[in-house]
């Protein structure tokens, strides 16, 4: 139509290319080659005991459910097992969308650094040399231990409170949840 030709002539973007709240054109983070940018993030997943949670068994079974899973071997300062959550650590190559993921007991700095070491070794086995890593500003990714695990790889962080920047891994976590 005529309206479309005029808008195209003046470089006006389509509505689907715009961010609804701000009206600005959405900038996409796309890497040109395999290994240019790897997105890394952690998803917190609640542990549900075998047989279901309190909605299935009733709230009176809460004490029984609390002691069901002691398999992690990780304890809090009161020597009680950390039974509330599992943490899904994920690394996704931004170009090929190749995923390395592990379900771990926590999201501490040592765990995140060890995960990255294994993920980087796995990417190397697949023939991918990682150049940059994009993470959020979580404490495990700001630590010196994680920085040392990265070595010569460039570390980029997302803007605070802006998970859309790390959208590839966020979408992967949502796909797993659905």
Task: Kindly give the residue locations of the regions a language model identified.
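Basic, flexible linker segments flanking DNA-binding modules
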Residues: 1-61, 139, 148, 159-165
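RNase H-like DDE/DDD metal-dependent nuclease/strand-transfer catalytic core used by mobile genetic elements
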Residues: 47-51, 57-178
């Amino acid at each position: 139509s005529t309206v479309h030709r005029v808008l195209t002539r003046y470089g006006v973007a389509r509505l689907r290319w715009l961010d609804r709240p701000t009206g600005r054109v959405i900038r996409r983070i796309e890497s040109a080659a395999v290994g240019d940018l790897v997105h890394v993030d952690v998803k917190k997943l609640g542990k549900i005991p075998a047989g279901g949670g309190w909605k299935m068994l009733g709230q009176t079974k809460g004490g029984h459910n609390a002691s069901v899973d002691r398999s992690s071997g990780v304890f809090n300062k009161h020597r009680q097992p950390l039974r509330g959550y599992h943490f899904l650590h994920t690394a996704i190559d931004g170009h090929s969308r190749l995923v390395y993921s592990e379900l771990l007991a926590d999201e501490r700095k040592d765990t995140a650094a060890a995960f990255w070491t294994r993920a980087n070794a796995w990417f190397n086995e697949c023939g991918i040399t990682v150049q940059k890593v994009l993470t959020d500003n979580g404490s495990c990714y700001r630590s010196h231990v994680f920085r040392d695990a990265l070595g010569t790889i460039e570390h980029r962080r997302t803007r605070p409170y802006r998970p859309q920047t790390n959208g590839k891994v966020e979408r992967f976590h949502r796909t797993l949840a659905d």
